[in-house]
């Protein structure tokens, strides 16, 4: 008996629930049908009597006939039915039924106490085989199928070795923080106490041990159960989660592992029935006294109702008993907190994919699949709750109103939701009324405006441009006229599918089903030439059947149907190949083909290929009977597979499931299929392909798998319209680059010729290659270009091109040192890759591989890198590319590694590769640099050859673009007098044209630096004539050039200065600049820095005489004009600055002999003209009188 605190919790009043069914009893005069009162396990002592303890039997002792019968009854029948069926039930029988009614398998406890249950895809098989869930009342295999082996209840039975239970627990969950693991630790630490089973009710206390921060806490736990399922749980910890807390787990495992230590009583109504009136009165009074503060109001209320003849309580026979199990009409399913499921899903959706909510929702979907495998009715129940929250997501309305698509993460969750509903609708043992109810609900959700569409769009996009073109005849009709297909449409369409077909039943029920010796005409299509059964159905639909079988715990049946589907695909492949051979000549002449598969299998909403692949590989997994081993860090180890022969007696028995898995994956990935419409659909194709390839990479290729791989690759290469690797493909078929990269890497060690042939064939990207003939409508599959944007349908084109580049890079790496293969790969790259950036990446990759730091250079691959670089130069010569300079520098580096002949070649053919600026400033300059000479160890003739080519290039570039190349040409030609003169003349001739003053000044400074001052003066004079410096441009960048030009002319002599000053006066109108020039010219005598041989006069120049007089007058006039200009818009805060300006002007005015008179007259004029500016004029008087 539990202590008083236990009873407080369990006896709190509540309305009658399924766990507390009405228990009736005969009148006092009636005969007691269950034997004498003393026959009950508790004896006449009732509450105070000693409890009956069940002894443990020897571990290997077989169950008695009583136990066998009690097990079956406890699993299948509600206890009320037992009571109705038999007038008298002996007490030992009652005890054994109550005993065996508790769940017997720890796997089920783990499933309801952890998201991260470690049951892998094969767990359904294990669960079904172990009888882990006697979930449904008599679950049957699909019609015609054999029941799963060992379907009798078993699992971890009572009395089993505790070690086995611990193993199951360890194999069941990963991660020390999970409730199941924590429950095991609580159980192992002895924290479970006061365990009492009263009928179908288990109670006990669980103590959380003290920690450094928290004291020990004891929680009261109560569990109700019925027919080997836990139907309700209560724990004092107040757990708010979808699944059971660690305390419920600990108590449940205690009952499973230590049944001999649990005090067992029959339902409390049985004990009460054995008491006489005095005992009952004593029992009630003691109970009220022990809990008077809690139950006294309820007790008085019940007493009043019982004493009232008209009360409702007296209208019903019997009274509720929470320990008597469920009634016949109660639904028999495991306890699932529906409100918590709703709240958790709502919370995860509100987080919008952040905080790991996507992973949590995926875990919930995985839990649904796990329940389906265990044939637990809560799977569909939980999925319904999840779907209701998904449909109520407020973001759906927002996305629809804005006409935007939902996020990829959310879209993937919706896809999984739709796929799960397909599995549920195709449940092979689904009752018709259940299926009808689900279909009604699905139709209701599908009719909602916010229900996401199957293609990932909301239909607000403009009609696809390709729908109006001739080639769109192969597509479905315009999106505006298409039937609306939501994520639930596939599941709703499942209403037409059934399992009653006799051929289908024979396929899934027998491994040895073959064609009969005498076939009727209607049966010939059902078998291939070897007598193997075929299943002729739409492939994704057939695979959905496989998924449904697999998901509902029928792995053998799923395998049989999978083999039949693969035999069908093989036959279709063979027939299409034969048809293609007859049409091959015509198709090759046309250069185009039709698509036989309008609906691709990879990226399909039903994911058919992945379904078949997983079904087959699950049968071949080695580790832990199909369970995915997980570390405590939840990191999965890659699965290990072995060859498992197809079931003995099968026509396919010479093959293994693993080879079939590889074959069907290759078939699906190699299928030629149209690129679907819409960004999400295209992205899904790429994502699913990569997922399937990652699973293929987990297979260790042995001889048998290599043979399968070779055979299928040959079929794909020879294939016609069904193969994406055939000789002719449709221009809008999905490229095979990613798939071919896997095939190339897998085949290379075993069959290099086949691997290269396949990879080279896959390099195609027809949607780009046929664009040149886009205007040609003679072929029905050519697209007319009616929009300026490039290929508007192919949203993932960038990703596809990058995968094409990866394939090419893989081939280049593998072919290192093989000249013939490298040449073939180079030609394929040049023909099929159309992105200059990607070709440049390939060139860089080839260069890195060809020039390793720890070994010698590979010249063949280096030449390939150079060829690719040259192609990039030609492709980007007339287009804008922000990486162009990087590309040019890299090409020169690559050519340098190749050798001097490569440098000479690019110098001589520069006009096809570079702009004049690039050729002179980067290419030629690098080619003749000291670093290059040392790197190549060039001798004198080679250096001269390079220099000659560089000079020729420089002159050609200078002629073509003198503005940008004149200076570079002079630099490159400075060591050759004739070439230098030619470059100089080009610069002079161009000076009168479009060259700017800054360009001319730069060249002039260079000429002075090289010792040609007169030529520098000539260029500076030309530059001065192109300059115009306004009065207020006192910070113009050309001021330094003007000052330098004046200093140059002054250093050359009086005549040069006299020639330049008129140009200065004409071009410069800024007073401060002119005054600065004038001051510099008067400080030193002209000609002091002149050329050798020219004599200087040695006298300072006078400002009153030419040529400085003209400069002086211009400076004074500039000051006067600037003064008036500044006074027009002057503000008081600039008065001080203006006075300083006048002070500088006075210095210039005072240079001539009568300068003071001119300045005084100037000031007087200012006072007269601007007398309104009194404050300013006052400052002028104070400073200048």
Curated annotation (Swiss-Prot):
<feature type="compositionally biased region" description="Basic and acidic residues">
    <location>
        <begin position="1"/>
        <end position="10"/>
    </location>
</feature>
<feature type="zinc finger region" description="SWIM-type">
    <location>
        <begin position="219"/>
        <end position="256"/>
    </location>
</feature>
<dbReference type="GO" id="GO:0031462">
    <property type="term" value="C:Cul2-RING ubiquitin ligase complex"/>
</dbReference>
<dbReference type="GO" id="GO:0005615">
    <property type="term" value="C:extracellular space"/>
</dbReference>
<dbReference type="InterPro" id="IPR048370">
    <property type="entry name" value="ZSWIM4-8_C"/>
</dbReference>
<keyword id="KW-0862">Zinc</keyword>
<keyword id="KW-0479">Metal-binding</keyword>
<feature type="region of interest" description="Disordered">
    <location>
        <begin position="123"/>
        <end position="153"/>
    </location>
</feature>
<dbReference type="Pfam" id="PF21055">
    <property type="entry name" value="ZSWIM4-8_C"/>
</dbReference>
<dbReference type="InterPro" id="IPR007527">
    <property type="entry name" value="Znf_SWIM"/>
</dbReference>
<feature type="region of interest" description="Disordered">
    <location>
        <begin position="1"/>
        <end position="45"/>
    </location>
</feature>
<keyword id="KW-0863">Zinc-finger</keyword>
<dbReference type="GO" id="GO:0008270">
    <property type="term" value="F:zinc ion binding"/>
</dbReference>
<protein>
    <recommendedName>
        <fullName>Zinc finger SWIM domain-containing protein 5</fullName>
    </recommendedName>
</protein>
